[in-house]
Curated annotation (Swiss-Prot):
Reaction equations catalysed: L-methionine + ATP + H2O = S-adenosyl-L-methionine + phosphate + diphosphate
Protein name as catalogued: S-adenosylmethionine synthase
Record-linked Pfam families: S-AdoMet_synt_C, S-AdoMet_synt_M, S-AdoMet_synt_N
Key words, A-Z: ATP-binding, Cytoplasm, Magnesium, Metal-binding, Nucleotide-binding, One-carbon metabolism, Potassium, Transferase
Domain of life: Bacteria
Binding site for Mg(2+): D17
């Protein structure tokens, strides 16, 4: 492969779509704390002065949707009308029904191992050894820029920052290996008291330089910091936000394929979420085991059916054993039935709010990021 550029973007926790994701997952977590068997599909819409929480939820738990919503928005940092959105005064509307009994009868079984998939669909997982967390570098560093923006905003280092922000990082590759960073874009909402010059200098010194490795930066690296010159109006006042509208930010930044299903607000019986997590777990363990440098796995399901309808592995010519053998190892060491993968990854726990910003993958606190099967896979593959 010759030289090429590849770009990924991330958005902050204060981006309207991410506000919606975090509210949906905060509701999910609160319900799972009380009712592990709950069925949750929670969607959120945010716009100036308003939050609408809807969806299908079947549970014996009781949660205060309004209180959860206000707390989530406040935690993000929207606590003043000066920012265009205020957790204390925004309207919170709720429109929640129950899961269709037609779906439910295909999911629940007397034998939990025969629990059917909550819907048909295709899911992808991916891993690459180009970073220490076995994720593509462009999305990894785009996320880290956004995490840094939130940190210096919340700790007072840059008090004029506001919650809404976006990042974009373009990496240059040479024969598939990272050769450097070609371009960095960072746009951040700010108070109207800061000048463009001061903002650009502060963002460079306090956000970009502490995050991006110096060895990948050069005199030819291009920086675009608030390139429009002004970003005062942001958050839900600037754009409406919806749950599930940042699926590429949530996953691999475009470096791998995506089945189309969003994650936030869905309990683990929804394979859109849980099987995508399991696919990442499989791919990461294959790469951690040294069986391939890059690995993409596709799984598919039929509604109400436990066994996956297909498993496909793509290793882009980097495999150390043939792909049929890889698939045999996946079937041997990973239970990809809905109930099996829920148990394998201990997914019935309130951990989802923290997934809803800065990516679902490449963050070691999540169970699907474990590499506990790597040694077993390597041994079974006969590699020393």
């Amino acid at each position: 492969m010759a030289k090429h550029l590849f770009t990924s973007e991330s958005v902050s926790e204060g981006h309207p779509d991410k506000i919606a994701d975090q509210i949906s997952d905060a509701v999910l977590d609160a319900i799972l704390e009380q009712d592990p068997k709950a069925r949750v599909a929670c969607e959120t819409y945010v716009k100036t002065g308003m939050v609408l929480v809807g969806g299908e939820i079947t549970t014996n738990a009781w949660v205060d949707i309004e209180e959860l919503t206000r707390k989530t928005v406040a935690d993000i940092g929207y606590v003043s009308s000066d920012m265009g959105f205020d957790a204390n005064s925004c309207a919170v509307l709720s429109a929640i029904g129950k899961q269709s009994p037609d779906i439910n009868q295909g999911v629940d079984r007397c034998d939990p191992l025969e629990q059917g998939a909550g819907d048909q669909g295709i899911m992808f997982g991916y891993a690459t050894n180009e970073t220490d967390v076995l994720m593509p570098a462009p999305i990894t560093y785009a996320h880290r820029l956004m995490e840094r923006q939130a940190r210096v905003r919340k700790n007072g280092t840059l008090p004029w920052l506001r919650p809404d922000a976006k990042s974009q990082v373009t990496f240059q590759y040479d024969d598939g290996k990272i050769a450097g960073i070609d371009a960095v874009v960072l746009s951040t909402q700010h108070a109207d008291t800061i000048s463009q010059k001061d903002l650009q200098e502060a963002v460079m010194e306090e956000i970009i330089k502490p995050v991006l490795p110096a060895e990948w930066l050069s005199a030819s690296t291009k920086y675009f910091i608030n390139p429009t010159g002004r970003f005062v109006i942001g958050g839900p006042m600037g754009d409406c936000g919806l749950t599930g509208r940042k699926i590429i930010v949530d996953t691999y930044g475009g470096a791998a394929r995506h089945g189309g299903g969003a994650f936030s607000g869905k309990d683990p019986s929804k394979v859109d979420r849980s099987a995508a997590y399991a696919a990442r777990y499989v791919a990461k363990n294959i790469v951690a085991a040294g069986l391939a440098d890059r690995c993409e796995i596709q799984v598919s399901y039929a509604i109400g059916v436990a066994e996956p309808t297909s498993i496909m592995i793509e290793t882009f010519g980097t495999e150390k054993i043939d792909q049929e053998h890889l698939i045999q190892l996946v079937r041997e060491f990973f239970d990809l039935r809905p109930y099996g993968l829920i148990q394998m990854l201990d997914l019935i726990q309130p951990i989802y709010r923290q997934t809803a910003a800065y990516g679902h993958f490449g963050r070691e606190q999540f169970p699907w990021e474990k590499t506990d099967k790597a040694a077993l896979l390597r041994e079974a593959a006969g590699l020393k």
